[in-house]
């Protein structure tokens, strides 16, 4: 499956515990069809102490979510992404509003 989303795109989360939140894509795993959105879908990660003198920690970390659970967001509207050619260059655009991404 091919995706038209890119790192740095502003997306809205469609389902899950963070439904309705807007964030920026931090990373995309194209083989597993997962995206990581900054400060969304946070989980607690336990880090063990490496030496007896150190203490273990619990940190907050973004967990990846399925790519179908996010949609491109711009000017208060979520939309699918299309591709058109202008001057022999591929341009991404929002299908609802027609504006370039």
Swiss-Prot record:
Q: Which PROSITE patterns does the UniProt record give?
A: RIBOSOMAL_L24
Q: Which GO terms describe its cellular component?
A: ribonucleoprotein complex; ribosome
Keywords in UniProt for this one?
Answer: Ribonucleoprotein, Ribosomal protein, RNA-binding, rRNA-binding
Give the UniProt record's GO annotations in the biological process aspect. Answer: translation
State a single Gene Ontology molecular function. structural constituent of ribosome
* Entries under Pfam families matching the protein: KOW (PF00467), ribosomal_L24 (PF17136)
Q: How does it assemble?
A: Part of the 50S ribosomal subunit.
- The identity of this protein, by name, is Large ribosomal subunit protein uL24
What the protein does?
One of two assembly initiator proteins, it binds directly to the 5'-end of the 23S rRNA, where it nucleates assembly of the 50S subunit.
The UniProt entry's sequence similarity note says: Belongs to the universal ribosomal protein uL24 family.
């Amino acid at each position: 499956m091919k995706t038209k989303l890119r790192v740095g795109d502003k997306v809205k989360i469609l389902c899950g515990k963070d439904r309705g939140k807007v964030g920026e894509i931090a990373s995309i795993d194209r083989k597993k069809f997962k995206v990581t959105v900054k400060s969304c879908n946070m989980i607690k990660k336990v880090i063990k102490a490496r030496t007896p003198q150190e203490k273990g920690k619990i940190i907050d970390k973004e967990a990846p979510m399925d790519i179908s659970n996010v949609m491109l967001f711009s000017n208060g509207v979520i939309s699918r992404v299309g591709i058109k050619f202008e001057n022999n260059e591929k341009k991404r655009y929002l299908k609802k509003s027609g504006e370039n991404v």
